[in-house]
C-alpha cells in the first residue's frame, strides 16, 4: 500500500514522503489517525496544495514541544507514596501518576508522553524520567519519590 505522509512518523518518514507500508498498518493506524493519505494522483495534487499549511502546522507543534521541554528541564517533581521500612512502595508510580504530577506543577503532559523504559517505579528515591513531547523533542524530568 502506497501512502503520502501528512506528518513525521517515527521509523517511517517525514512530511510529504511517499512510503510503501503493509496494508494493515496503513488502514488501521496511519489513515484513521490522519497521519497519511492514499498515494493517488488526486491526493498527490491536493497534498502539494496543502504542503505549506501542513509544514507550518508541523513547525508550530515542534516549537510548542520545544517550549514545553524548556519548562520541563527546570522542573523537579516530588511524589509522595506509602512505603515500607526498606523503601519498597506499596503499589507503584506509573506514567499516569507522573503525568498528573507534572500537570499539577504547571506543564501540561499527557500520560502517553511519559516514558518509563524500566517499568513502573517501585522504590523510594530519585529518578530521571524521559518525556517524549514530539518525534524530535524529548525532555528529562527529575522525579523524587518519598515515603508518606
Curated annotation (Swiss-Prot):
Signal peptide: none annotated. One of its GO terms (molecular function) is rRNA binding. InterPro entries: Ribosomal_bL9 (IPR000244), Ribosomal_bL9/RNase_H1_N (IPR009027), Ribosomal_bL9_bac/chp (IPR020594), Ribosomal_bL9_C (IPR020069), Ribosomal_bL9_C_sf (IPR036791), Ribosomal_bL9_N (IPR020070), Ribosomal_bL9_N_sf (IPR036935). Disulfide bonds: none annotated. One of its GO terms (cellular component) is ribosome. Keywords: Ribonucleoprotein, Ribosomal protein, RNA-binding, rRNA-binding. One of its GO terms (biological process) is translation. Pfam families: Ribosomal_L9_C, Ribosomal_L9_N. The keyword Chloroplast does not apply. PANTHER family: 50S RIBOSOMAL PROTEIN L9. Belongs to the bacterial ribosomal protein bL9 family. Binds to the 23S rRNA. This is Large ribosomal subunit protein bL9. It comes from Pseudomonas putida (strain W619). The lineage of its organism: Bacteria, Pseudomonadati, Pseudomonadota, Gammaproteobacteria, Pseudomonadales. The gene is rplI.
Amino acid at each position: 500500500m502506497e501512502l503520502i505522509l501528512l506528518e513525521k512518523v517515527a521509523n517511517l518518514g517525514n512530511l510529504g514522503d511517499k512510503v510503501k507500508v503493509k496494508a494493515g498498518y496503513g488502514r488501521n493506524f496511519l489513515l484513521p489517525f490522519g497521519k497519511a493519505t492514499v498515494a493517488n494522483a488526486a491526493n498527490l495534487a491536493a497534498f502539494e496544495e496543502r504542503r505549506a499549511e501542513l509544514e507550518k502546522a508541523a513547525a508550530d507543534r515542534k516549537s510548542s514541544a520545544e517550549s514545553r521541554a524548556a519548562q520541563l528541564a527546570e522542573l523537579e517533581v516530588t511524589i509522595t507514596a506509602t512505603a515500607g521500612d526498606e523503601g519498597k512502595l506499596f503499589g507503584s508510580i506509573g506514567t499516569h501518576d507522573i503525568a498528573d504530577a507534572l500537570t499539577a506543577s504547571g506543564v501540561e503532559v499527557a500520560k502517553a508522553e511519559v516514558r518509563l523504559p524500566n517499568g513502573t517505579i517501585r522504590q523510594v528515591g530519585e529518578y530521571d524520567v524521559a518525556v517524549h513531547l514530539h518525534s524530535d523533542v524529548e525532555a528529562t524530568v527529575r522525579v523524587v519519590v518519598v515515603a508518606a
